[in-house]
A protein has these predicted regions:
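N-proximal low-complexity "stem/linker" segments adjacent to membrane-targeting elements
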Residues: 1-25
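Short alpha-helix within the catalytic core of nucleotide-sugar-dependent glycosyltransferases
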Residues: 20-21, 45-46, 104-115, 158
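Acidic donor-binding segment of Leloir-type glycosyltransferases
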Residues: 21-67
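Active-site nucleotide-sugar/metal-binding loop of Leloir-type enzymes
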Residues: 76-92
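Short beta-strand-to-loop acidic/aromatic patch adjacent to the donor-nucleotide binding site
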Residues: 89-101
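Conserved donor NDP-sugar-binding/catalytic core segment of glycosyltransferases
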Residues: 101-136
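Conserved nucleotide-sugar donor-binding
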Residues: 147-162
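Acidic donor-binding loop at a coil-to-helix junction in glycosyltransferase catalytic cores
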Residues: 167-169
C-alpha cells in the first residue's frame, strides 16, 4: 500500500530533525514526503533542504503566510499547500506535526489498519515526557478519536469528506 506524507512546519528547527530521522528510518518508506516551510524565521528551511538533498522521496515547498496565530487555519492551509505539491499517487495520505518522533514500525503498523474496508482515518497515541522525564501515554480523547498531530486518511475517505477545511477547533 503506497502512502504520502505532508509535514506543515513553522519555526520547528528544534524538532524537525528528530521527526525526519524517524521518518527516513521507517521499515516501510513513503512514496513521497512533502515538507511545507510555512513562513519560518528559524533554520526550518535549511533543515528541509538538507533532508531533501539526502533522500529522493523528500521534497520541500515554501509558503508565505501571516505571522498572526491562526488556530486551526494556518496549519490546514500549509497542509493544503503541500497537497498541491504532491506528485505521486497515494492510497493513504498522512499529515504529521513536525515535533513528533516515530517508532521504526509506525507506518507498517498503521497501514495494516487500512486493510480493513471500513477504515477511513487512523492515527496513533501520543507518548509524552512528563516533568519527571518519564514517558507516558497522553490520549485525552475517547478511543474513536484520532489526534490531529498524526492523521492518516484513506484516499477514498479524504475525497469523500472534501479534504481538510480551515477552521478553529
Amino acid at each position: 500500500m503506497n502512502y504520502s506524507v505532508i509535514v506543515p512546519a513553522h519555526n520547528e528547527a528544534g524538532f524537525l530533525p528528530g521527526l525526519l530521522d524517524s521518518l527516513c528510518s521507517q521499515d516501510c518508506l513513503p512514496n513521497e514526503v512533502v515538507l511545507v516551510n510555512d513562513n519560518s524565521t528559524d533554520k526550518t528551511e535549511e533543515i528541509m533542504q538538507d533532508y531533501a538533498k539526502k533522500h529522493l522521496f523528500v521534497r520541500y515547498v515554501n509558503r508565505i503566510s501571516s505571522e498572526e496565530h491562526q488556530p486551526g487555519t494556518k496549519v490546514v492551509r500549509a497542509f493544503q499547500h503541500g497537497l498541491k505539491a504532491l506528485k505521486e499517487p497515494y492510497t493513504v495520505l498522512v499529515k504529521l506535526d513536525a515535533d513528533l518522533l516515530l517508532p521504526p514500525n509506525y507506518f507498517s503498523t498503521l497501514l495494516t489498519m487500512f486493510q480493513q474496508e471500513k477504515v477511513g482515518i487512523a492515527g496513533g497515541f501520543c507518548v509524552e515526557q512528563n516533568a519527571a522525564g518519564q514517558w507516558e501515554v497522553n490520549h485525552p480523547m475517547h478511543k474513536g478519536h484520532v489526534r490531529g498531530a498524526f492523521k492518516a486518511y484513506h484516499s477514498n475517505c479524504f475525497k469523500a469528506i472534501g479534504g481538510l477545511r480551515p477552521s478553529m477547533g
